[in-house]
């Protein structure tokens, strides 16, 4: 196929478009054939918008700004009709604008997961792809939970990795942000500062080093941690800072209780004072994770109620509140007036089975459709929590919602499947995702898996595998989906033949015990392939068991 790009000076966008096409077909460049014209016109409409116009061999992608042009390129690529040798673009129905202003994804750089271990060049390419699917910001955290002090090697490793990610995003025109756990201390926090742990009842995420800001000297100690974190990015520039209440965080002493509606907003006020000294233009976000999830009969403990009062009075500077939970969407923000723009925090990484991503891809499309439908009327975007590449499909699902809240997952993921795999297998892959989800949810909730669903998912995956072109067949997005369908069947078969009905059998199934597949050579090969994709190679199992596939002995061979 002969292609010519008229960049009009938009070289970053042109380079990414060319590279994306080269990855799919063999094109001859700057020759007579299809012409792709790139342009920016801010008069067309809202920021970050685009329009695709043209027919036959001349197409024009116009953005209202640099990001809008990237999104237009993404849509042209994702919606085009591709063959092995060429593609036919599809025009948009007028100007396309995002419904939600805040569209971030959170790269969790810890636990020796993919973001932690992947080389920078992989993260560059992935961030480009995340951008093309419609995101406009990347968040990271400098994980105090892992640190003894700010002089150890781990601190510099985390700092350098987060800085590299931020530079990637900024170079593309995206915004960047960080999260500060408002009262979390280092692992060496003096015992005299420790928080009252009573607020952790029925909550996870307490490493034992959270701090009570009301203890003499504790606020100064916390302030020194916040400033140290914030100082690491002054040359790059932070566009957002979010404070976090629980997991990690919290204090149950009388002066702080209820933490979410009392101690946390007051501590966040102090964080904000330090933020604006270094980043006067940064937007400030308050998270409400785990709010009111511990009940004192006959009513919740009043964390949302207390926070909303602060937002109406001494916290007028807050730009967004983040509202979400591990399970269904919290009710309070749905039933009360919106006092600040609300964003969500979809739990796409840790719902259900362990290790996270240890069997491969983790599609949960029906679950996320239900949660989105229950909350979309109050949302101005969100930030999926990501531990790696294995939940890529869910990032794309939420990106689709943030652009068009009324879209259904089948439409969003249908376009994803057609582009990433083939337009000939859309229905089959959607069914694979739904079958994987069915058993994922059954097992997560303590039920027996549906054996017929597991067999059907594997059969479909094997059939799809024979229909894909070499590029799609070997691409990591298909490999992790294919491996998930295969490994699920193997795990459920072992459970069915050896464990069903025994004590703790369903708990062991939920955790994917290593011994389930220890003697299955085919499974071991597939699991080791996952480890290579995730870069969990030659690591001690105990260091990264959260995201380490359940390979025999916790070791991975470097060569196939």
Specify the residue positions occupied by each region the protein language model found:
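Contiguous, structured surface segment used for ligand recognition
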Residues: 1-100
């Amino acid at each position: 196929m002969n292609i010519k790009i008229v960049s009009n000076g938009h070289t970053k966008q042109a380079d990414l478009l060319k590279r994306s096409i080269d990855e799919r077909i063999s094109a001859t460049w700057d020759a007579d054939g299809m012409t792709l014209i790139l342009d920016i016109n801010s008069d067309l409409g809202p920021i970050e918008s685009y329009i695709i116009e043209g027919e036959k061999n001349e197409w024009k992608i116009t953005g209202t700004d640099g990001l809008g042009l990237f999104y237009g390129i993404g849509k042209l690529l994702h919606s085009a009709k591709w063959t092995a040798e060429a593609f036919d673009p599809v025009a948009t129905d007028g100007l396309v604008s995002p419904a939600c202003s805040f569209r971030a994804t959170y790269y969790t750089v810890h636990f020796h997961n993919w973001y932690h271990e992947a080389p920078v060049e992989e993260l560059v390419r992935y961030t480009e792809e995340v951008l093309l699917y419609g995101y406009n910001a990347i968040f990271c955290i400098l994980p105090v939970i892992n640190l003894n002090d700010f002089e150890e090697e781990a601190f510099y490793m985390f700092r350098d990795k987060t800085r590299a990610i931020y530079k990637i995003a900024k170079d593309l025109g995206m915004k960047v942000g960080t999260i500060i756990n408002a009262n979390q201390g280092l692992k060496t926090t003096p015992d005299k500062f420790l928080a009252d742990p009573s607020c952790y009842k029925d909550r996870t995420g307490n490493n034992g080093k959270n701090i009570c800001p009301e203890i003499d000297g504790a606020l100064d100690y916390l302030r020194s941690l916040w400033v140290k974190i914030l100082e690491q990015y002054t040359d790059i520039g932070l566009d957002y800072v979010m404070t976090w209440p629980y997991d990690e965080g919290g204090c149950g002493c009388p002066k702080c209780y209820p933490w979410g509606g009392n101690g946390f907003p007051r501590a966040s006020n102090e964080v904000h004072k330090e933020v604006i000294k270094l980043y006067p233009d940064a937007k400030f976000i308050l998270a409400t994770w785990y709010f009111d999830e511990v009940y004192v009969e006959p009513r919740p403990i009043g964390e949302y109620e207390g926070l909303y009062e602060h937002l109406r009075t001494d916290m007028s500077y807050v730009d967004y509140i983040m509202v979400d939970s591990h399970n269904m969407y919290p009710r309070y923000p749905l039933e009360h007036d919106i006092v600040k723009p609300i964003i969500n925090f979809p739990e796409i990484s840790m719902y259900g089975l362990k290790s996270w991503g240890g069997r491969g891809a983790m599609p949960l499309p029906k679950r996320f459709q239900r949660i989105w439908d229950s909350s979309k009327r109050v949302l101005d975007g969100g930030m999926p929590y990501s531990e790696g590449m294995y939940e890529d499909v869910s990032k794309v699902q939420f990106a689709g919602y943030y652009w068009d809240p009324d879209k259904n997952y089948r439409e969003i993921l249908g376009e994803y499947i057609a582009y990433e795999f083939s337009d000939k297998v859309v229905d089959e892959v959607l069914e694979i995702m739904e079958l994987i989800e069915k058993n994922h949810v059954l097992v997560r909730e303590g039920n027996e898996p549906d054996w017929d669903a597991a067999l059907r998912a594997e059969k479909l995956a094997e059939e799809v595998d024979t229909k894909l072109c070499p590029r799609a067949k070997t691409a990591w997005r298909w490999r992790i989906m294919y491996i998930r369908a295969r490994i699920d069947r193997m795990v459920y078969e072992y459970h069915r033949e050896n464990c069903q009905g025994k004590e703790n059998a369903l708990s062991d199934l939920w955790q994917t015990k290593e011994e389930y597949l220890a003697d299955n050579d085919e499974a071991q090969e597939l699991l080791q392939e996952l480890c290579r994709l995730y870069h969990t190679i030659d690591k001690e199992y105990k260091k990264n068991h959260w995201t380490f596939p359940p390979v025999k002995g916790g070791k991975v061979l470097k060569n196939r």
